[in-house]
Amino acid sequence: MAQVPAGKNRSGQLSKQTGDAWENQARRWLEGQGLRFIAANARERGGEIDLIMRDGTVTVFIEVRYRRSARYGDAAASVTPQKQQRLLKAARLWLCRQNGSFETVDCRFDVVAFTGNDIQWLKNAFGE
């Protein structure tokens, strides 16, 4: 694991590194399922989309979640309605920058959840 410079937010840095590692694992796993990578960590006003991929002709916005155990609920349960709204807003803005919209682009919202060693792929987990 990379060294975190002194004086930096060590907890935040480690969380970012952990998140990046799980997002990379999700990307590789989804590519193995036939999806094609478009973008990672797409930041838009009000939110960030972990992965954007294509499944055939469908643009897929993917939220990646990890929990060490299901003690407080599995990873998928951590995608709250508020988080869903932020993702919808970010996706709408991202599509707009690509000259698209929910009306013109076939898209869906998936969640890839890692709980311990288990992976769960929730296709069409939520929508607008």
From Swiss-Prot:
GO terms for molecular function: nucleic acid binding. NCBIfam families: PRK12497.1-3, YraN family protein. This is UPF0102 protein KPN78578_35270. It comes from Klebsiella pneumoniae subsp. pneumoniae (strain ATCC 700721 / MGH 78578). InterPro entries: Restrct_endonuc-II-like, tRNA_endonuc-like_dom_sf, UPF0102_YraN-like. Residues 1-20 are annotated as: Disordered. Coiled coil: none annotated. Belongs to the UPF0102 family. PANTHER family: UPF0102 PROTEIN YRAN.
